[in-house]
Amino acid sequence: FKEEMRDCDPPELPNRLAEVVKRPKSDRNEGDLPDPEQELIVATSGGKDSAAMALWLRFESGLPNPMHFVFNDTGHEHELTYQFLDVLADNLGHTIERSEAKYDFLSLAKHKGRFPSAMARFCTTELKVLPMQRWMGAQDLQDPVLCQGVRAGESKRRSQMTVWDDTLGDFGGFYDIWRPILRWSVEEVFAIHKRHNLEPNDLYKMGAGRVGCWPCIHVRKGELRNAFRRDPGLL
């Protein structure tokens, strides 16, 4: 392994690797909507929840805000996810733009000398958060709102999140974070897919519990075994 690393150029890493800096919680109420002039950055992962959020924002929210649908490519995605994003873009009638990490998952793990853990999910920061912030910083955005398709029912950590939050971006400015489907049930997620004639990512039919960055090393062991049985090349 050390010989391999000597032969490889180190990945280009940003200087600031810490989690994004927090400022006081947003003073918005849970039911508040973005101001009409704010631009919505709709984070789209290829999963059912972010797709449900995108459908709701595009067709059912009634919001007049400019919307940018953005997929952050971690370099560790299943081909079915790319195919689903093409179908989703057609359904939305809207281009899904892409932000990309500067290095892939394995390069990051080699640089760190370890894999991420439940207590140190640096993969999320380095492969999702910072690339999205860099994408936002490269655009001429007017008071952006980052829309995240997460639900409280997914995990204990997410159950402690708030609908509105704000954070300091790596590009130097604060921006709002909005989680409009935080209180939705999984039944509501699948219902909006059905209303808009959109089949969820086919990975769910193969037993995947989560599909972004696939296979995620944080999924259940049984799900990993199932993924490796279906695709031995993953090993």
Where are these regions (language model features)?
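Nucleotide-activated chemistry modules centered on ATP-dependent adenylation/adenylyltransferase
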Residues: 1-235
